[in-house]
Amino acid sequence: MSKLFIAVLLGSLLAIPAAAQTGQQSGAGSANPLSTWLRNAYMGNRNTIVRSAEKMPEENYGMRPGTQQEVRTFGQQVGHIANYNFLWCAQAKGEKNPNAGTNLEKLNTKAEFLKALNDAFAYCDGVYSSLTDASGTEMIDITQESGRQTRNLRMALLILNFAHNNEIYGNIVTYMRMKDIVPSSSEPRPQQQQPR
């Protein structure tokens, strides 16, 4: 996980000067290029995950890609994303996890999983929307899954959350492809009208 985190962080930092050179940064983004990039990346990933979870039929929420019971079902993958969005965004906010003690991987229906996912993303949306480059570089206390206490940059934790969402979305894509369902990130994009 740490190699993935470092790769995402370095990719983020390298993308900023390139975006600035091509004129993609403007307004508030030019004052906060790191947090603007992260917010936009998170929102794109968030929307892709929600659309894919909505697109998967209810009967496939219990499927696994094989016979191994330790591999999460599609629904459990959705619940896993919700669990970690609550955990890491609560820590980034400096709040108690509003979902503490509840394992969203143990839900039963598509409607329950979608509600948990949307609630978790709604909770995180405020964290990402209020993030600035300055607030992102503040050191915060973090409790890891093992219970170990550590300190890290707020933005580092939110980059980890984004990267983890992306990692689990990769699993979701596999489940969808196994059922011959086109994931939302691969859907055809509407053609834009060309000026005449």
Give the location of each predicted region.
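N-terminal secretory signal peptides that target proteins for export/translocation
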Residues: 1-2
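Bacterial N-terminal signal peptides
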Residues: 5-17
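Boundary at the C-terminal end of the N-terminal hydrophobic targeting segment
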Residues: 18-22
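Short N-terminal segments immediately surrounding and downstream of signal-peptide cleavage
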Residues: 23-47
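Short, contiguous alpha-helical
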Residues: 39, 43, 47-50, 61-102, ...
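Well-ordered alpha-helical scaffold segments within catalytic/enzyme domains
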Residues: 48, 52-53, 89, 123, ...
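Short, flexible helix-adjacent loops and helix caps
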Residues: 57-61, 93, 129, 133-136
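Acidic/histidine-rich alpha-helical segments that form the ligand environment
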Residues: 106-143, 150-168
